[in-house]
Amino acid sequence: CYRKPAVGDDDKDLLDLIDTLNQYVGVTITYDFGDDKEVLDGTTISTWLSEGTDEKVSIDEEEVLAFVKTLAKKYNTAYSPKELKTSYGTTVTVTGGFYGWRIDNSGEVEQILADLKAGKDVEREPVYLTTANSHGEHDYGDSYVEINLTNQHLFLYKDGKLVVESDFVSGNLSKGHDTPTGAFGLTYKTMNAVLRGPDYETPVTYWMPFNGDVGMHDATWRNKFGGSIYKTGGSHGCINLPASAAKKIYETIDKGYAVLVYRMPGDNPTVVQQPQADVPSVINAISIIGPVTLESETAIVNARNMYNSLSDADKAQVTNYDTLTAAEAALAALKAQQPADGGQQ
């Protein structure tokens, strides 16, 4: 005779167990990483599953975490060096900072478990702690703030186009307040803030922090920017900007916008590489000059050089050329009455 099995093939708990196992291994999760895809399916999921002591399906969360860590190792870019072709034509490696893609390991484990229990195929991004602008070769894409500490000069690019260009004053070297280099994401932005430290309390109109208490802001107490001011008359670490430049930057960028801060080899300013000139780029270069101040000189000179490089036929198509000549005249008038440097902290 045969012993009757303790559990028959019509046992409800057994059938529920089988249904749950089939549900879990039947799920496919497709991860989007820009042009790349990663697929999690039953082949991997099945290795995580076992029967628990309560006749329920048990998922080995340590194995799920190990899978998530393989994704993170392959696709995380936060804290990694960034290659940047600068506005000066050279390529630098920006080290330090936290900008980039970073998967939330525990958050992604929880999301995978939820997807399995929902029993439906999904296509999605992983759960991130921090995100970036692009999954391409450069995670900051074509929209970023470029801050050159060596030349004390800033460039703001939006969708590959130069929107703002300005001199600035960074952290005071002689007092140990050097502005840190690295790739960062804008933390937030706000107007009419008061910046406080152990020995100062400074109201500013445009406040854009990107690395703790270090950020970009207007510095209306200064009448000169750029050059070597920062070496002995610099800030407490922030990027001090002319009010007009700070306003344009504030109006263009939002939380998470890439800010790349670097130094170039040597200590002498390098000539900015002129963009490839065509009619639309010249019109754009003229349009971003805005209200003319002493800090507009670089933008005006760049626009003039770009215009001069055009053919006569193309020059005739620059519809805002009168704006350029008016800006040049206004700058000349300002320089003629330029006051002596009273550079304040």
Q: Where does each model-flagged region fall?
A:
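Alpha-helix boundary recognition
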Residues: L113, K117, Y200, P209, ...
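Exported/periplasmic cell-wall-interacting domains
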Residues: A66, D178-T181, A193-Q274
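Beta-rich interaction/scaffold domains
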Residues: Q274-Q345
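Short, flexible active-site loop motifs that bind/organize anionic cofactors or intermediates
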Residues: D54, F98, H236, N305, ...
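Short, polar loop/linker segments at the starts of domains and inter-domain junctions
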Residues: V39-L40, E201-T202, G226-Y230, E295-I300
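Surface-exposed, secretory/extracytoplasmic low-complexity segments enriched in Ser/Thr/Asn/Gly/Pro
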Residues: C1-E201, Y206, I253-K255, L260-G266, ...
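Surface-exposed flexible segments
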Residues: T43-S50, D159, F225, Q274, ...
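Stable alpha-helical elements in mature extracytoplasmic
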Residues: D60-F67, E108, A245-I249, A299, ...
